[in-house]
Swiss-Prot record:
SMART domains: KH, S1. SUPFAM superfamilies: Eukaryotic type KH-domain (KH-domain type I), Nucleic acid-binding proteins, Polynucleotide phosphorylase/guanosine pentaphosphate synthase (PNPase/GPSI), domain 3, Ribonuclease PH domain 2-like, Ribosomal protein S5 domain 2-like. This is Polyribonucleotide nucleotidyltransferase. The lineage of its organism: Bacteria, Bacillati, Bacillota, Clostridia, Eubacteriales. Its cofactor is Mg(2+).
Length: 702
């Protein structure tokens, strides 16, 4: 039986059909918002997965190009692996939901969001977060706290819920807020240097609308929700926990109080060896339980240290940033490099400039077709001193790369100001917390070193949180390192300039953040950001005046758009010849702007521009031109006076004396002065060598 429920969000209808599709799924809903439709299916394994120490939740976000009436590009005409955007949207769905599952739940859970129809005014990723929450709540899977999501824009000083395409074009803020009815679960934002107060108010504005959507979900669950399955939650054996803590608590505590990370880890390894020696025979089949007890003990000690002793593992104050190091220009042949170090976290970012034709072509459901600025993030195993195979980028690498990219996007100059494609690659050399925000800092250094005229330098910082079990007490921590991230409750990343915020991403391991915590984190991040920006400016205060000698050079010329066809030629014949003859790259825009780029061959750029100017220049009647003879006939000579533009010098116009044979006066390849005497109604050009000579003689006499 099909059940339909409706509500209104931002003046548009949100509709849910339950029982319409996916009859064999634990829960399946067909959800629409305007003409955007997403199908969400939620399922869980019947038994917990053995031998793991994490919750195996997987979220998939599947874009179908038929949803926007497109056929996939390329040779294979079907969707392949998920796009980067699909991966980012899947991560955005995962983050607010994961903390709300019961601790110790080890059953595999999969949520599949399939985008079936897209109206660009209504973002499918926002609908998918709401639908994933509702599907879980309606299912028998032990998930009981609804989560809602909205997008918030800022146009002309007014906040807008779920802005349309036209509004998104004018917004200076792109914010996603996810929340339960009581607390904020997740925030993602990109902005054009938004001040902290405005950002905080925008988050609260979105939070209020989330409460209405949560109420709608609660109504749906009350009517249609299944009875929840009996939970089988993993918990370490009580006897094992008691015995291991009795034996090792003091040793673990002593190790955890060592400030140096390497020394601390070395001491912990020794403690683990002692625990193994003590209990390997007594609890030979309880290895997972022993491992869990060690983890819980470490977590208890670190959290108590932070919350009750006002002490951080490395001895810093709660608002103190680790020592900062900045260096530029360390790679001699690249276009720009930045090496950023914060404590034991170190990132090297390399900037590469290319022609506008080097943009990344996108084949997705969004209207955006290409990307001129991109940032890629690599996290090799050696950055944490581990050994593992090096594969392609995973979801984490893609997510961190996009986060750092978003932080700098509002600061990148337009293609008119800086006619280059820009690629940044951040190599994580050492990781001890917040490498994504170190990538923002490294990217700023690399851009400045490359001579990219960014509006202002940007920096990023990660804020952390420790709360009491009842959530009544909380402490915000500046510049969290790995141990504080691992055992803490929040990773609140903020990037921006001295003027304001350009990106935010935060998620939490607890059941949401209070409003005051969000405000404190924003204020603490600003203080830390300004400190880091000061260090960056000490290293390189402004973009270099000159590009690297190894970087390409681009020149811009403007022509009449009606003349574009003359530059391209039939089947691209003309432009391809220019490219082949001058060894340049040429990008033509519809408005008549032409970008000519060459790698270390400035003469090629000049030659190409000269040819293009000739192709688009109008032949003026009465003007004298220096042309080249291209062909002779018995009635005259054809002369090219501009690239691709020929005229005829009749035999009677070649000389003052009578000419019997054209070749007696000119030959193919000769350069001669000619005057344009006439252009007929078919565009044919008549020339005269005789009149050109006469005019030059007349000018000499004057």
């Amino acid at each position: 039986m099909i059940h339909t429920l409706e509500t209104t969000v931002a003046g548009r209808k949100m509709k849910v059909d339950f029982g319409k599709t996916g009859m064999l799924s634990n829960a399946a809903i067909f959800m629409s918002y305007g003409d955007t439709v997403v199908m969400i299916n939620a399922n869980a394994s019947k038994e917990p997965r053995e031998g793991i120490d994490f919750f195996p939740l997987s979220v998939d976000y599947e874009e179908r190009l038929y949803s926007v009436g497109k056929i996939p590009g390329g040779f294979i005409k079907r969707e392949g692996k998920p796009s980067d955007k699909s991966i980012l949207h899947a991560r955005s769905i995962d983050r607010p939901l994961r903390p709300l599952f019961p601790n110790g739940y080890r059953n595999d859970v999969q949520i599949v969001n399939t985008v079936l129809s897209v109206e660009q005014d209504n973002l499918p990723e926002i609908l998918a977060i709401n639908g994933s929450s509702l599907a879980l709540c309606l299912s028998s899977i032990p998930f009981t706290t609804p989560v809602a999501a909205v997008s918030v824009g800022l146009v002309d000083g007014e906040f807008i819920i779920n802005p349309t395409v036209a509004q998104r074009e004018n917004t200076i803020l792109d914010l996603t807020v996810c929340a339960t009815k009581e607390r904020i679960m997740m925030v993602e934002a990109g902005g054009q240097e938004i001040d902290e107060e405005t950002m905080y108010n925008a988050i609260l504005f979105g939070f209020e609308e989330c409460k209405n959507i949560v109420a709608f979900q609660e109504e749906a669950v009350a009517k249609l929700g299944k009875t929840k399955d009996e939970q089988v939650l993993y918990k370490a054996d009580e006897e094992v926990e008691k015995e291991v803590k009795r034996f090792a608590f003091d040793m673990i505590k002593e190790a955890m109080y060592i400030m140096d990370k390497d020394e601390r880890n070395a001491q912990l390894d020794k403690v683990k060896e002692k625990i193994s020696e003590e209990f390997s025979q007594k609890y030979e089949d309880k290895g997972a339980d022993i491992k869990e007890v060690i983890y819980k003990t470490q977590k208890e000690i670190v959290r108590n240290m932070l919350l009750n002793e006002d002490r951080r593992p490395d001895g810093r104050a709660f608002d103190e940033v680790r020592p900062i190091g900045c260096e530029v220009g360390i790679l001699p042949r690249t276009h720009g490099t930045g090496l950023f170090t914060r404590g034991l976290t170190q990132v090297m970012t390399v900037a590469t400039l290319g022609a506008l034709g080097d943009v990344q072509i996108l084949d997705g459901i969004a209207e955006e077709e290409s990307k001129r600025y991109m940032h890629h993030y690599n996290f090799p195993s050696y950055s944490v001193g581990e050994v593992r195979p090096l594969r392609g980028p995973g979801r984490r690498e893609i997510g961190h790369g996009a986060l750092a990219e978003r932080a700098l996007e509002p600061l990148i100059p337009s293609q008119e100001e800086f006619p280059y494609t820009i690629r940044l690659v951040s190599e994580v050399l050492s990781s001890n917390g917040s490498t994504s925000q170190a990538s923002v800092c490294g990217s700023t250094l690399a851009l400045l070193d490359a001579g990219v005229p960014i509006k202002r330098p940007a920096a990023g910082i990660a804020m952390g949180l420790i709360t009491s079990d009842d959530l009544e007490r909380e402490k915000v921590i500046t510049d969290i390192q790995g141990i504080e991230d691992f055992f803490g409750d929040m990773d609140f990343k903020v990037a921006g300039t001295e003027k304001g915020i350009t990106s935010i991403q935060f998620d939490t391991k607890i059941k949401g953040l209070s409003n005051s915590c969000v405000k404190d984190a924003l204020e603490g991040a600003k203080k830390a950001r300004l400190h880091i920006l000061g260090k960056i400016k000490e290293c390189i205060p402004e973009p270099r005046k000159e590009l690297s000698k190894y970087a390409p050079r681009t020149e811009i010329i403007c022509i009449d758009p009606e003349k574009i066809r003359d530059v391209i030629g039939a089947g691209g014949k003309v432009i391809n010849k220019i490219i082949a003859d001058t060894n340049v790259k040429i990008e033509i825009k519809e408005d008549g702007k032409i970008f000519v780029t060459s790698n270390n061959e400035p003469e090629g750029v000049k030659k190409a521009i000269s040819i293009i100017e000739g192709l688009t220049k109008e032949v003026v009647q009465g003007e004298i031109y220096l042309g080249k003879v291209t062909k002779t006939t018995n009635f005259g000579a054809f002369v090219e006076i501009l690239p691709g533009k020929e005229g005829l010098v009749h035999i009677s116009k070649l000389d003052f004396a009578r000419v019997e044979k054209v070749e007696d006066v000119v030959s193919v390849g000769d350069e001669i002065l000619v005057k344009v005497t006439d252009i007929d109604n078919q565009g044919r050009i008549n020339l005269s060598r005789k009149d050109a000579i006469a005019k030059k003689e007349e000018e000499k006499d004057k």
